[in-house]
A protein has these predicted regions:
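Core segments of cupin and vicinal oxygen chelate
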Residues: 10-56
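Short secondary-structure boundary/capping segments
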Residues: 30, 38-39, 63-66, 106-107
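Vicinal oxygen chelate
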Residues: 5-12, 41, 61-139
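N-terminal beta-strand motif that seeds the catalytic metal site of vicinal oxygen chelate
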Residues: 1-17, 74, 78, 129-139
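Short, structured secondary-structure boundary patches
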Residues: 52-56, 69-70, 116-123
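A generic structural signal for short beta-strands and their flanking turns/coil linkers
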Residues: 4, 36, 45, 70-72, ...
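A short, polar/proline- and glycine-enriched secondary-structure boundary/capping micro-motif
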Residues: 58-62, 136-139
Length: 139
């Protein structure tokens, strides 16, 4: 199945720390860049960090199970193996988890692994994986 790629633009406070985070921590490949923005390849999707400090604002939260989840966040649904590997990579780099890696809905059809981290501009990213990928959009 071929999946369309998404494009997401988001504000950042500063470009150099952003470049370091997305390339070194997450392993993104660099695309085009200027002195105002940087393109990244995030697991095959195009994300663009735009220098716009005034738009980097605190986000509200919602409760999901027992976690306080930022309502504004983005991320990628990975295969179980890639999710586990990314968890380990981030732990080894001593990046602070906003929400530690965990399994939600254990032993249910919608069982999923999830964790949240923040970039240097406080943009929140969630990486998750479904034990059964066919359950991503099931009710």
């Amino acid at each position: 199945m071929t999946i369309s790629r998404f494009h997401l633009a988001f504000p950042v406070i500063e470009l150099e720390s952003t470049k370091k985070f997305y390339t070194e921590v997450l392993g993104c490949k660099l695309g085009r860049q200027s002195n105002k923005w940087i393109d990244f390849n995030l697991f095959g999707h195009q994300i663009v960090a735009h220098f716009s400090p005034d738009d980097c604002i605190k986000t509200n939260t919602n409760m999901v199970d027992v976690d306080t989840v930022p309502s504004r966040h983005f991320g990628v649904i990975l295969s179980w193996e890639k999710w586990l590997a990314l968890c380990e990579k981030i732990k080894k780099q001593k990046v602070r988890f906003m929400i530690d890696p965990k399994i939600r809905f254990k032993d249910q059809n919608s069982e999923q692994g999830t964790f949240f981290i923040q970039d240097p501009s406080n943009n929140v990213l969630e990486f998750k994986s479904f034990k059964d990928d066919s359950m991503v959009f099931k009710k």
